[in-house]
């Protein structure tokens, strides 16, 4: 007669202990971020930009949105090896249900597509601190962080956080390279700071047939400052990235926007603050199934 209450008590104690030691994996409360910003490059052929100035601004936005694990890489820290290592570590630390934000502010460049997954024959790449602007003996392209490489790293994070998790990637960089289609002049501001290169990083004899491999759809949402063939300009008076600034302002004022409203607000901001060329921000990936506003919810008191 007395054994049943004892077993019941033991069962309840096990439940309590389990809840104490794994609340984050069950509730999915951990918000993690990696913020990368470059204003300097090892190769001085790159133009001076202010990507490093975006970092504290984005950090503040994330803290207000309840992010407790915010990691940063700035300038010399953001080598290709440093970025890859940071993304791998971030992924290994993630739990099912986590919310993950990855931000890159810096130069972008197109380069020779090596695996044939691009219909235009060019990969888009983030430019780490140690990447060169032109093909040379010191850098044959291995220091660029291509969209293909990023896809592998981000897919690993996506797998770790599972279906209940959220992964948002923000790229405040130029993807245009040497492609000029779609670059309609809209001003004469010669001192606009451009985040990117007009030249393509060409790898001799390495180009794959265009579109021969096909592309896999992103399993996350990416917010880009411009289309892959456009140029990204900074906000001249504040010397920060337009996309970074616009997002911070947007989620300071609004907390429950649809993805369509977010994209419309970002486009309106770019039109209000034009550079020498038109740029069109866009949301890609799982924008039909993942709410961006859900990433930027206000932190509750005590969190």
Give the residues covered by each predicted segment.
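Bacterial N-terminal signal peptides that target proteins for export
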Residues: 1-11
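Cysteine endopeptidase catalytic domains of the caspase/legumain-like
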Residues: 16-303
């Amino acid at each position: 007669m007395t054994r049943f209450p004892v077993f019941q008590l033991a069962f309840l104690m096990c439940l309590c202990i389990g809840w104490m030691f794994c609340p984050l994996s069950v509730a999915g409360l951990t918000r993690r971020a990696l913020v990368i910003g470059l204003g300097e490059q090892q190769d001085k052929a790159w133009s001076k930009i202010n990507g490093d100035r975006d970092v504290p601004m984005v950090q503040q936005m994330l803290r207000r949105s309840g992010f407790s694990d915010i990691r940063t890489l700035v300038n010399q820290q953001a080598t290709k090896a440093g970025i890859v290592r940071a993304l791998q570590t971030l992924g290994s630390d993630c739990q099912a249900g986590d919310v993950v934000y990855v931000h890159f502010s810096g130069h972008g460049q197109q380069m020779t597509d090596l695996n044939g997954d691009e219909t235009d024959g060019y990969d888009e790449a983030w430019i780490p601190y140690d990447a060169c602007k032109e093909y040379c003996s010191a850098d044959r392209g291995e220091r660029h962080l291509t969209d293909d490489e990023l896809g592998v790293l981000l897919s690993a994070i996506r797998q770790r956080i599972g279906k209940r998790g959220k992964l948002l990637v923000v790229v405040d960089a130029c993807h245009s390279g040497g492609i000029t289609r779609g670059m309609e002049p809209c001003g004469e501001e010669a001192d606009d700071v451009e985040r990117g290169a007009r030249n393509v990083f060409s790898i001799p004899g390495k180009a794959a047939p265009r579109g021969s491999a096909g592309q896999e759809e992103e399993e996350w949402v990416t917010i880009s400052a411009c289309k892959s063939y456009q140029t990204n300009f900074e906000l001249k008076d504040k010397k920060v990235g337009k996309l970074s600034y616009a997002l911070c302002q947007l989620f300071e004022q609004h907390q429950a926007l649809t993805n369509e409203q977010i994209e419309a607000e970002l486009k309106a901001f770019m039109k209000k603050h034009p550079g020498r060329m038109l740029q069109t921000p866009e949301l890609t990936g799982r924008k039909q199934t993942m709410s961006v506003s859900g990433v930027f919810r206000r932190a509750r008191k005590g969190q």
